[in-house]
Amino acid sequence: MADTATTASAASAAASAPNASTDAPPFQLGKPRFQQTSFYGRFRHFLDIIDPRTLFVTEKRLREAVQLLEDYKHGTLRPGVTNEQLWSAQKIKQAILHPDTNEKIFMPFRMSGYIPFGTPIVVGLLLPNQTLASTVFWQWLNQSHNACVNYANRNATKPSPASKFIQGYLGAVISAVSIAVGLNVLVQKANKFTPATRLLVQRFVPFPAVASANICNVVLMRYGELEEGIDVLDADGNLVGSSKIAARHALLETALTRVVLPMPILVLPPIVMSMLEKTALLQARPRLLLPVHSLVCLAAFGLALPLAISLFPQMSEIETSQLEPEIARATSSRTVVYNKGL
């Protein structure tokens, strides 16, 4: 009760501060700044999460942000602190520190580092005239990066065997490499394709390979949820029970997100580049092809990531009538919520 009272008094102090920002909403510790019920609100929320500027936050600035949030929590906030400063401090902390362990996440594996560190891999995946070795290398590197990001941002409240992550990683690598190599071989053997058509088709091979690997990774790493169910909560955040049906919904939403995510990243650049390569500028200056290709991939990646992860709210809602009878009987709420996962 003491913590609740001090937090409430801190919230009141922040809201009534004379220099409080009129644009920023009242600060809520641990809550998203933007409403999660609308796609636009989720989009704005995830733009904050993937903001690459947080990669350049100094150790001193991080300590100041953490201390400011601690002061807010304990009701010892200094006068004049604005809601904007509190939201900024929370953004910095959430971008750098793991929420369960409070340890710093290695920079390339932070969500804010996903685009800057992942774009070179996307460029490699979409390079024309891939050899067998380069196809295997880029697919392996992409799945390795994804696995590290997933592990670094995992739910660490409960111990999870390393074998689960290894199983998901190996499954994703094997499926991605197998499909990419298989499709490349089929395209090479397709006699009906002209050399230009064959090159164009080969550029789209990474998408089905990556999309199928993403689904494989989700299923292998989270199949236990289908057997045991996931927690569902009422409107007040109280645990209602564990539901296998909610687990199926969560996995389906996550799988759809991971199929949609690589679509613009791996489909748009080949289309755009096939048109740009015909321009007089790039035909006269072929050395510009790689830099232009990289910029196109960066733009596609930067647009696709927040759009894809904004499709579904992190805490999804479902009617109790769609769940197991014991769940419906355990609560008077018409709907419950569940965490769909990363």
Curated annotation (Swiss-Prot):
UniProt note: phenotype after gene disruption: Knockdown in brown adipose tissue attenuates whole-body thermogenic responses upon exposure to cold. Brown adipocytes show decreased glycerol-3-phosphate levels in mitochondria.
Induction text: In brown adipose tissue, expression is induced by cold.
GO cellular component, one term: mitochondrial inner membrane
InterPro entries for this protein: Mtc (IPR004686)
Membrane-related topology note: Multi-pass membrane protein
Known tissue expression: Expressed in liver and brain. Expressed in brown adipose tissue.
Keywords carried by this UniProt record: Amino-acid transport, Membrane, Mitochondrion, Mitochondrion inner membrane, Transmembrane, Transmembrane helix, Transport
GO biological process: amino acid transport; positive regulation of cold-induced thermogenesis
Bilayer-spanning residue ranges: 105-125, 165-185, 256-276, 289-309
Chain residue ranges for the region called Disordered: 1-30
Molecular function via GO: citrate transmembrane transporter activity; monoatomic ion transmembrane transporter activity
Catalytic activity: citrate(in) = citrate(out)
Pfam hit, one: SFXNs
Biased segments, Low complexity type: 1-26
Subcellular location: Mitochondrion inner membrane
Role: Mitochondrial amino-acid transporter. Transports citrate. Does not act as a serine transporter: not able to mediate transport of serine into mitochondria. In brown adipose tissue, plays a role in the regulation of UCP1-dependent thermogenesis probably by supporting mitochondrial glycerol-3-phosphate utilization.
Family the entry assigns: Belongs to the sideroflexin family.
PANTHER family: SIDEROFLEXIN (PTHR11153), SIDEROFLEXIN-5 (PTHR11153:SF17)
Name of protein: Sideroflexin-5
Source organism of the structure: Mus musculus
UniProt gene name: Sfxn5
